[in-house]
């Protein structure tokens, strides 16, 4: 199983290193015979001798083309002859490529920016993560001492925790009497002990949570300061920290550094990405948070160190559990795309598609288009019309079906052969013409991207079929990861067409796909309404909610399935409308804002939920009660009564103060805040009293009654004394409770002023409610 590749230099020449696991053992293979190259298109082949004479300087040595050969390729499906130019060393290419490109006889150069080790994987047909080797994993985490205003890594590391299949342990240099804690004499000894643990356990995978941007850099800097050689690589190297866009990325040679943070950011949508929030979202269990100031206080006073050690141990354990959860999917993506898991786990979906296409282009002898320069990038920023959205029908509706197109955009790309190499192609016998935009796509041959996409969807169906047939739970899970990886990649192709930095960028393709998408959903809506008596309540891009007013649940379900048979017989190619769900009740507010409840009483909301921590418990609780009243009981008037009751209790100071606490996180050093929100004002007052505040600290506060700015009236919750303080009822009504429910009740004709307890007027409710069945 290939874990990764890189290259080193011996006697001025590159040597590819292949890090792999074979028969349970780690090994490194070497290849000294792979040469770097680029392609050049010449106006006249006779100019090749002039091109071979071009020289450049690199670190005091002269760089030139060492040999050239003429090769037949395809470019966007059309035959082309280019020159393959070979060089001595990969770094020769950036040194000389501009000079070659600027030569008058050169039309253009190609594939000059593909990293050498990645090029090797493509050309040799090698697939990382292929095979059934069992990989050893080890997660680690650090706790540090930080004081405001300090430079990064100025404070010591207090604890290093690690976890693997054998359990979790903590290394520290203060005496803590717990069975999973190993105590050493100094910070230096702690780092050395950790390095020894890694060497002895010899994991194939090191798992971190934001290790790219914190743990490794901190450890490396402290090691330098303390005179420790921070050796973690299997061939005796230190971790390599490199910039990747606006972030950093850390490589450990011979081991896969699997940083969960970018993977989880790409995979799931959460209001906050703390380790605690992620763990609760994935596993449904809360995890205790110990804040930086608490850690500092415990370390400096010696009180509460056991709690900090337990927290540190749990951090490593949770990171390990999350790693086990997410690693198999990334391994499948790595196999699918053909690049290392280290790269894939840090890639956007657009980059995943690009690496997949580069490999397939090589296999099909296609020359890859170049990435855009700055001028071309600016030109590509033009927008185009997106998917169809039908504005929602207001009111409370019952017996609702949700129908959507299976893989709408991939299906359109394949069905209509939407590809840069088929776009407006001359001399074709048959074309598909995109509605509204008029772009033509040749149907005489399968386009490069539609054919690849077709293969992917076909493979996914085979995997799903195999998954259904197998009774082995482990095999079933692996097959599920495979089909999900294929789905992620397949669903990214449409977005890739419109991705400005893409090699196979094609605005005409992207806007044609959305044009066909709009046509299909609009036609489908018209058919279900005119021929089957449905009313479509809300539609967005590839699906819609619909009901038959006055009909019972069984009638709606039966007619929906009849419609599916009817419409799918008419849809071309791979296009297929599917029955996705039935909801006994629902309402739709505006685009991407709705709430529905299924037959098991499970409520699904989109765009309405308040999950950020800067909403108080009273706001969240009131919104949940309002949703239940409307969706479970079908009673909008009851929902309004709930809001009036809560606002009345707030006005009369009958709400427990713990339900009014607002939590907000400090995200930068206090001195860097230009605007002073309530949480910043409270944090500054705490800091002035000597309490340690750092980025990541969560401030819990309550707003008091009085005049002046909110920030001046916000105090830490633990200072709130009901005998001395009164909360600002008006603030909580106007800024917490009403905003949480107003967006829901607006769908039934209510305005904010209609919801306060002292208001009695109601707005024509009957006009908004639909007949129940």
From Swiss-Prot:
Family: Belongs to the DNA polymerase type-B family.
Family matches, as Pfam families: DNA_pol_B, DNA_pol_B_exo1
Swiss-Prot/TrEMBL catalytic activity: DNA(n) + a 2'-deoxyribonucleoside 5'-triphosphate = DNA(n+1) + diphosphate
Name of this chain's protein: DNA polymerase
Keyword terms: Disulfide bond, DNA replication, DNA-binding, DNA-directed DNA polymerase, Exonuclease, Hydrolase, Multifunctional enzyme, Nuclease, Nucleotidyltransferase, Transferase
Organism the protein comes from: Thermococcus gorgonarius
EC number(s) from the headed UniProt entry: 2.7.7.7
UniProt gene name: pol
GO molecular function: DNA binding; DNA-directed DNA polymerase activity; exonuclease activity; nucleotide binding
Record-annotated disulphide pairs: 428-442, 506-509
Functional note: In addition to polymerase activity, this DNA polymerase exhibits 3' to 5' exonuclease activity.
